[in-house]
Amino acid sequence: FDTIFSNTITSYNPDNEGRSSGKSGSDIERILAFHKIGRRDPIEYIEPWEKVLQNAITTENDFKDEEYRNRLTKIQYDVTRNSATERPFTGEYWDEKREGEYLCICCGRKLFTSEMKYDSGCGWPSFYSEHEDANIEQIEDRSHGMYRVEVKCSYCDAHLGHIFNDGPMNKGGKRYCINSASIDFV
């Protein structure tokens, strides 16, 4: 595996010794692919692997950020990328009653279904559970002098809202309090 890939030069701008800068689009894709499988790329780079990897991650994040800015509305961007919160009773889906699915606005991953939604009276869409494939990330949040648990899309890192322990007890007691701006209804 390593021998095959180490003989595959993908850089468009190698130095005199054939080492890659790690900055071309194909380099970045390759570096991130190796990182995703938990390996170092066997290609020799001009900079140390850690620096090349960090550059690739930063470049990818910058590209994604620009894509999000162009595709999302201001409130969608502020909520999902900057962990903002929309005002209660203002979001598009807080009172949604139709049957369907709720997807991450950034990546389209299925997060919730209408069967999981209930009226908590809080002014944000509330769900007692997440879809079995959602794998929503839960992160301790001590901002604003409070203790909460933030929920994020584990696929694209979009801020969704918070989870609380005041949901329906017969459904597990959880309340996913989700910003309408972070989801799409289909």
Q: Model-predicted segments: where are they?
A:
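Nucleotide-activated chemistry modules centered on ATP-dependent adenylation/adenylyltransferase
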Residues: 1-59, 67
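A short Gly-Trp-Pro
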Residues: 60-65, 69-186
